[in-house]
């Protein structure tokens, strides 16, 4: 974040115009996305987050297609669902379609969805002027909007990586979100069950369901987390059949689509995962390992496993 934006962010964080701010955050947080039946479609949110990162860094959200073609495409490939669409094409979809949401403008009138005209006409996009002006006037809104977008499209394990990738400091984003809790936003919608985490850890004997790690310090589990199979942001319930106890590493890899469960409750490693060191290559040894929950533990529901396979797992399974 540029020094000017940082100073403005800090100055406005505690005296923001909640009426105007709520409107801007609501506009950026209510993008039209194809999410029928739990389908993930983070393309537009990733473009807005990238624009917010540029606005925080240089004071302008202007994004030439020559930059978006590679940077946005890389974000979609890393954080989006599995797709066979070419990278440039995957970036062209949100770059042109976001105009219909009223928060994005292009400096050339080009057809929807086509990458060719964007390149030939050297098109540049940016946030709609009234949106950009409001964000520059109250930079704390950048963090509030970013938090709304990232938390409604990604789990907590992945959200900081997304923010880092677009040039936003996760600590500042989440601090801004704490100060600015917009009524009706995604973050104030469904309420999480505060007892779910403990029930999941206990059901799996406080050990990683994939590798068996069960470290403790002073009697408390260390780096053992409750993972949603179907993400909470996409209708995943806080229920026993949607939870796994996983170590921090395997939770992260599971949410990034490098690890998967099949319906036989066997661990699957993506062929796109690679490692050279002995420690890294230990991930390969998880492939084909069967889960062995203690008697009475609810197994992950097939419907939740199938969602994760369709919407999160990347690439093909590792060869046996």
Where do the protein language model's features map onto the residues?
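Short cysteine-rich clusters marking metal-coordination/redox-active sites
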Residues: 2, 208-211, 247
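Mixed-charge, low-complexity interaction segments
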Residues: 2-181, 191, 264-270, 276-278, ...
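A detector for short metal-coordination/catalytic motifs
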Residues: 13-14, 191, 216-320
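Short, well-structured alpha-helical interface segments that form or flank functional binding sites
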Residues: 42-50, 191, 195, 199, ...
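Active-site catalytic microenvironments for nucleophilic, acid-base chemistry
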Residues: 54-57, 214, 249
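Short, charged surface segments at domain edges that flank catalytic/cofactor-binding sites
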Residues: 149-150, 157-216, 229-241
């Amino acid at each position: 974040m540029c020094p000017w934006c940082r100073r403005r962010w800090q100055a406005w964080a505690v005296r923001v115009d909640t009426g105007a701010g709520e409107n801007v955050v609501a506009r950026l947080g209510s993008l039209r996305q194809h999410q029928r039946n739990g389908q993930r479609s983070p393309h537009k949110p990733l473009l807005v987050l990238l624009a917010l990162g540029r606005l925080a860094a240089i004071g302008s959200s202007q994004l030439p297609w020559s930059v978006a073609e590679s940077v946005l495409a890389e974000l979609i490939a890393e954080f989006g669902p599995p797709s066979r669409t070419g990278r440039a094409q995957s970036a062209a979809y949100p770059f042109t379609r976001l105009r219909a949401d009223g928060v994005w403008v292009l400096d050339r009138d080009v057809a929807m969805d086509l990458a060719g005209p964007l390149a030939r006409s050297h098109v540049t996009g940016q946030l709609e002027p009234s949106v950009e002006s409001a964000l520059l006037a109250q930079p704390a809104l950048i963090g509030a909007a970013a938090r709304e977008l990232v938390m409604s499209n990604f789990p907590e394990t992945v959200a900081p990586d997304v923010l880092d990738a677009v040039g936003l400091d996760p600590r500042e984003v989440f601090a801004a979100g704490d100060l600015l809790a917009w009524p009706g936003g995604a973050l104030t919608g469904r309420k999480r069950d505060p007892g779910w985490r403990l029930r999941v850890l206990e059901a799996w004997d406080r050990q990683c369901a994939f590798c068996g790690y069960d470290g403790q310090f002073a009697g408390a589990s260390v780096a053992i987390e409750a993972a949603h199979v179907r993400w909470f942001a996409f209708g995943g319930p806080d229920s026993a059949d949607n939870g796994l106890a996983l170590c921090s590493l395997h939770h992260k890899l599971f949410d990034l689509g490098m690890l998967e469960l099949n319906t036989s409750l066997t661990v699957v490693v993506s062929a796109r995962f690679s490692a050279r060191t002995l420690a890294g290559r230990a991930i390969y040894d998880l492939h084909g390992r069967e889960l062995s929950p203690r008697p009475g533990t609810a197994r992950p529901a097939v419907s939740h496993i199938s969602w994760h396979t369709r919407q999160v797992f990347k690439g093909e399974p590792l060869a046996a």
